[in-house]
A protein has these predicted regions:
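A short, N-terminal "cap"/entry segment at the start of jelly-roll beta-barrel domains
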Residues: 1-40, 118
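Conserved short histidine dyad/triad with adjacent acidic residue
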Residues: 27, 31-58, 88-92
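Short glycine/proline-enriched turns and hinge-like loops at secondary-structure junctions
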Residues: 40, 58-60, 77-79, 98-99
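Short, well-ordered beta-strand segments in beta-rich or mixed alpha/beta enzyme
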Residues: 43-48, 67-70, 95, 105-108
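Glycine- and acidic-residue-biased ligand/ion/polar-headgroup-sensing regions
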Residues: 50, 59-74, 81
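Ligand-binding loop in jelly-roll beta-barrel domains
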Residues: 78, 89-116
Length: 118
């Protein structure tokens, strides 16, 4: 991302990138949209296949998920399309998809993304 340049991305034209998660024994899918070189902030589309829940973990970054399709299942409840869920930095959490349907979210971090399983 160049400073001072607008970015427009046709997300429909991007291919889903498969990311195998050894802890879960399943793949998750993403489309990377933007990474800010100054702050490390990241924006991506993430798809959790039906039944996949990312087990208890933390991040050294805050992050939000805007639900586009399906239902986001979290340790605090379920959230459908149009919902925005914010997770503070360091919070222990679980999130993923319902058993019967994939969930697609717009995933936004405030700095570089890392995951630490508990």
């Amino acid at each position: 991302m160049e400073k001072g340049q607008m970015i427009a991305i046709d997300t429909q034209a991007l291919q889903w990138e498969e990311r195998f998660n050894e802890k879960l024994g399943r793949a998750l899918y993403r489309k990377n949209l933007v990474t800010d070189p100054d702050t490390g902030m990241e924006i991506r589309l993430v798809r959790y296949p039906a039944g996949v829940i990312n087990v208890r973990h933390t991040h050294p970054c805050a992050h939000g998920m805007y639900v586009i399709e399906g239902t986001l299942v979290t340790h605090a409840g379920q959230f459908g399309p149009g919902s925005f869920v914010w997770f503070p930095e360091g919070m222990a959490m679980e999130h993923g998809a319902t058993a019967d349907r994939d969930v697609v979210v717009l995933f936004i971090t405030n700095k570089p993304f890392e995951i630490h399983y508990l």
